[in-house]
Amino acid sequence: MTKPIEGVVIGFDFGLKRIGVAIGQTITRTATPEAIVASKDGKPDWEHISRLFEEWKPSAIVVGLPMRLNGEEQALTQPARKFGQRLSGRYQRPVYYIEEQLSSIEAEQRKTKTDQPMDDHAAQIILENWLDAL
């Protein structure tokens, strides 16, 4: 993996209804949950995403790729990859992919409120795993 420009990195947990977003820092190698972006049939709220890019000015993008436990692709793998390509094209930043096996389960275990969506926490876990691999 080529190390991106140091600074802020934005991470995504892609879903057809919701997209979790986390913000990370390559210097401290930490990430925090930031937002849950609405998505309708896989079409993200690009205005919301643009506001996040304007606010945080990330140097790179990380997208979790949903994979089966045996490492094979599943139904959401290609849509997540396409989402990453669209992000890179729109915002002119390098995109990095990381397998996101079990990130939603880990996010569920971490969260404190049981009635809240955890997509942003799943994005945090994805981003933390990517930062740990730098």
Swiss-Prot record:
EC class of the enzyme, as a word: hydrolase
Family annotation (SMART domains): YqgFc (SM00732)
Role summary: Could be a nuclease involved in processing of the 5'-end of pre-16S rRNA.
CDD domains registered for this protein in UniProt: YqgF
Family: Belongs to the YqgF nuclease family.
Protein's name according to its UniProt entry: Putative pre-16S rRNA nuclease
InterPro entries, per the entry: RNaseH-like_sf, YqgF, YqgF/RNaseH-like_dom, YqgF/RNaseH-like_dom_sf
Lineage: Bacteria, Pseudomonadati, Pseudomonadota, Gammaproteobacteria, Thiotrichales
